Amino acid sequence: AFCNLRRCELSCRSLGLLGKCIGEECKCVPY
């Protein structure tokens, strides 16, 4: 599976975090 940055950003934003694609993984990181 490949990381969809848009979807990653949206799901992380609901947690108050910033979404980043690291390789094929979505990571939620603090701003």
Curated annotation (Swiss-Prot):
Subcellular location, record wording: Secreted
Region ([R/K]XCQ motif): 6-9
Signal peptide: none
One Gene Ontology cellular component: extracellular region
GO molecular function annotations of the record: ion channel inhibitor activity; potassium channel regulator activity; toxin activity
Keyword Hydrolase appears in the UniProt entry: no
Modified residues (Tyrosine amide): 31
Disulphide connectivity of cysteines: 3-21, 8-26, 12-28
Alphabetized InterPro entries for the sequence: Scorpion_toxin-like_sf, Scorpion_toxinS_K_inh
Transmembrane segments: none
Alphabetical UniProt keywords: Amidation, Calcium-activated potassium channel impairing toxin, Disulfide bond, Ion channel impairing toxin, Neurotoxin, Potassium channel impairing toxin, Secreted, Toxin
Primary location class: secreted
Organs and tissues of expression: Expressed by the venom gland.
UniProt xrefs under PROSITE patterns: SCORP_SHORT_TOXIN
Pfam families the UniProt entry points to: Toxin_2
Something else known: Negative results: does not show inhibition on KCa3.1/KCNN4 at concentrations up to 50 nM.
Free-text comment about domains: Has the structural arrangement of an alpha-helix connected to a beta-sheet by disulfide bonds (CSalpha/beta).
Function statement: Blocks small conductance calcium-activated potassium channels. Shows activity on KCa2.2/KCNN2 (IC(50)=0.0243 nM), KCa2.3/KCNN3 (IC(50)=1.7 nM), and KCa2.1/KCNN1 (IC(50)=42 nM). Induces cell death when tested on human T lymphoblastic leukemia Jurkat E6.1 and human breast cancer MDA-MB-231 cell lines which constituvely express KCa2.2/KCNN2, but not on human peripheral blood lymphocytes (which do not express KCa2.2/KCNN2).
Family affiliation: Belongs to the short scorpion toxin superfamily. Potassium channel inhibitor family. Alpha-KTx 05 subfamily.
Protein name from the UniProt record: Potassium channel toxin alpha-KTx 5.4
Organism: Hottentotta tamulus (Eastern Indian scorpion)
